[in-house]
Amino acid sequence: LGAFHGVPMTVKESYNVAGTPTTWGNPDWRDNVTQEDAECVKKLKSAGVNVFGKTNVPLSLADFQSYNEIYGTTNNPYDHERIPGGSSGGSAAALAAGLTGLEIGSDIGGSIRNPAHFCGVFGHKPTHDLLWLRGHSAPGDMRSTPDISVIGPLARSADDLYSAIKIMAGPDPIMSRGYQLNLPELGARSLADLKVGVW
């Protein structure tokens, strides 16, 4: 059995999950049903997760809220008058509402970090090239993603983030440049064990 055997999870709508629409919130792509899972989804499924749904995004992942004409508005589960952040706002809202225990988001300018903060959950924007981006691109877009674009997990605990990163990490044989995976074991167990740099 895999490390996440039986764990139910949702995935940000912009990821390919076989048999589901990947629209990036764009009505023009409403009928774009993907045939293959994104690489990170494959890795998590091989660890035993059960992907049972996809979560809302703003149009083209380009906003700090989570509204589009296809799926409507996602609100912050703690206060429906507030936004959950974006572009992984549906991901963070699903975690905060207790709908899911694990999520995958994406981040260029705060799209994991902002919703995690707004919804009181954990999110991690990892180092570029640590996790595979293939299967997370706009329909028909075969270009390489910008160097600042990464994917990463969201969860209800830092331990779950770390576990997900360990499963999802690894070189992409097509897109990665030089690659070396070296994730040390967690050393800090309390605030006294941490060093903080300020500049």
Predicted regions span which residues?
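Phosphate-binding glycine-rich loops and adjacent basic patches that engage nucleotide phosphates
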Residues: L1-P8, F52-P58, E81-R82, C119-D129, ...
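A generic secondary-structure signal marking the coil-to-beta-strand transition
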Residues: V7, A47-G48, G120, A192-K195
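Structural signature of FAD isoalloxazine-binding scaffolds in flavoprotein oxidoreductases
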Residues: R113-F118
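A short helix-breaking turn/cap at a secondary-structure junction
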Residues: K125-W199
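Gly/Ser-rich catalytic/binding loops embedded in alpha/beta enzyme cores
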Residues: L1-G109
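Electropositive phosphate-/nucleotide-binding environments in soluble metabolic enzymes
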Residues: T34-A38, V121, A155-D159
